[in-house]
Amino acid sequence: MPLDRVEEVHRKLGLAQGLIDSAVGIVVHRRFRDGDDSDPVIQRRHDALVRGVAVLDGVVRPVVDRPDMGSLAVAVALEFLDFRLPDFDWRGIASELPSWLGVIASRPSLVATQPGIEQPPF
């Protein structure tokens, strides 16, 4: 990782981790509370998702040949939202992220590790 981009990469890593943390909290709550989203904790987690996506929309750069760890983490977090919280319309919050994700998610490494894709034997 280039030293001049360490802070940028760590910022994206932190934001991606925050999205995943909030999303997992909502998923677990729904599984054990019959999908009741009226709990204030769930509302706080939902608000954190909205804020995180809005911030990331202004942070991501065009995809390059070798994306950094932060970009990969953001892509995984957004795909996790699609997979586990399909009712959360993060694309309605972000203007740049949907097209950015379309490009980075087409990388062979991300395509090969999507849920439901058969993994090659080792």
Walk through the language-model features, giving the residues of each.
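Non-globular targeting/processing and membrane-anchoring segments
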Residues: 21-22, 52, 78, 113-122
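Short helix-capping/linker segments at secondary-structure and domain boundaries
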Residues: 21, 31-34, 81-91
